Amino acid sequence: VRSSAASDVYKRQVLAFAQAIKELKAEGGIVARNKRYSENNRILIEEMAKLGIKPYIESTHQGPIITTFYYPENSNFDFAEMYQYIKDRGYAIYPGKVTDAQTFRIGTIGEIYPEDMYKLSSIMTDFLNSKK
């Protein structure tokens, strides 16, 4: 027998899953969703390259979910400061402490679209320019 609270949690989870499936179908299914995620990732990598920021993983091995980048080659760079700058402007990135290298990560899935990749790039450009 489930408790009332556990039952409510279960119902919310089922409803959330049903909504996620509905949104996936509305977007055109898995193929269309993957296309958007892949496009987000392509744009992100291109925009970061313009800033001189290189991906940690070679493109042949890179998936469209999250991308790890090396820190910019700027002696004034501070990840915590950049993180806060980006967060204050409505976006989030992640520390890249899954490697021994100095890296950070950016996700490209979920409610994220190509225009978000361009906006994030613009925010990062402004931040890095302020450090010159």
What are these regions (language model features)?
Residues V1-A6, Y10:
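Single conserved hydrophobic/aromatic residue that forms the stacking wall/gate
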Residues A18-E23, T125, N129:
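Short glycine/serine- and small hydrophobic-enriched flexible loop segments
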Residues I21-Y56, Q84:
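Conserved PLP-dependent catalytic core of the aminotransferase class-I/II
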Residues K54-Y85:
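Conserved PLP-binding catalytic core of the aspartate aminotransferase-like
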Residues F79-K87, L120-T125:
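Short amphipathic alpha-helices in soluble, non-transmembrane regions
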Residues R89-R105:
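Conserved PLP cofactor-binding pocket of PLP-dependent enzymes
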Residues Q102-K132:
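PLP-dependent enzyme catalytic core of the Aspartate aminotransferase-like
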